[in-house]
Amino acid sequence: VDVFEDGGLRVFGPRKNAAILEGSKAFSKDLMKKYGIPTAAYENFDDPQKALAYLETAKFPIVLKADGLALGKGVLICNTLQEAQEGVRSIMMDKKFGSAGNTMVIEEFMTGREVSVLSYVDGKTIKTMTSAQDHKRAQDGDQGLNTGGMGTFSPSPFYTKEVDEFCKSHIYQATVDAMAKEGREFKGIIFFGLMLTKDGPRVLEYNARFGDPEAQVVLPRMKNDILEVMEACVDGTLDQVDLQFEDNAAVCVVLASDGYPVSYEKGYVIRGLENFKDKDGYYVFHAGTKKTDKGIVTNGGRVLGVTA
């Protein structure tokens, strides 16, 4: 974004100094603490020995988070001291996620319903989109390893009017204002990963971009022209936009390669895409695919997202 702006181009998205909201979990946790935005209790560590010592007195389960970007896989939920010690060693000492693991956030484990809320931001004004609920486990019945997301639906039945009002008062605008006060004006998309706990909504994480597969159920329900909304964010006129969504629901199921998220083969031909031609209200979103002479083939872990 910085490079484009330096070249005199209009671009939608946060500058580097604002994208740190997602780029560093330690930064975002410290920001929430400073400005009173509700989140889980936590400590930051850049010394693995101090992290290991802290775990000796911690309550379990506990959550370990690599500070930097780790393709959505840098979060470990540890039920025992031994699991947590192994997590610290693999992330901080063995550098499983490279420099993303130089600093680690260790935070309390929160229970409740997870909800995702995407929003447009123009630096001052924030307009939230409809809610979505993501399912991260690789296998049916909420089993298996955590992934980048295996499917999602929108809206979330747990995101009630009361929850929305609380988040508007204590989380959404507060985050935008906090970034502005820090001299890091945020323009673009803020994705709020929320946990609806018995004590009220808490922020799990921020992303500085659309969620995948959340965008695949939220955007098809949006009535506005997306380009007009993005231009309003760039121009700082988002307050003049009336963001509207269809009063319906959408579901997205991710088709993934066998063995994802651990190891999987690529290069299988995908058949049946033509069945979606002229089908209104059905979408196939490509992710890990590649065009070849023999047709479109699988080329990643999460291959397609099918939305209805």
Please place each PLM-identified region on the residue numbering.
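Short, well-ordered beta-strand elements within core beta-sheets of diverse protein domains
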Residues: 152-155, 253-254, 302-308
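Generic C-terminus detector
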Residues: 289-292, 298-308
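General beta-strand structural signal in soluble alpha/beta enzymes
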Residues: 11-14, 41-44, 62-66, 77, ...
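Active-site "cap" helix and flanking loop/linker of ATP-utilizing ligase/carboxylase catalytic domains
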Residues: 168-190, 207-279, 287
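Internal nucleotide-binding/catalytic subdomain
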Residues: 74-217
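Short beta-strand/turn micro-motifs at beta-sheet edges
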Residues: 139-141, 240-242, 289-296
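A short, GP-enriched loop/loop-strand-helix hinge that lies immediately N-terminal to
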Residues: 1-23, 37-46
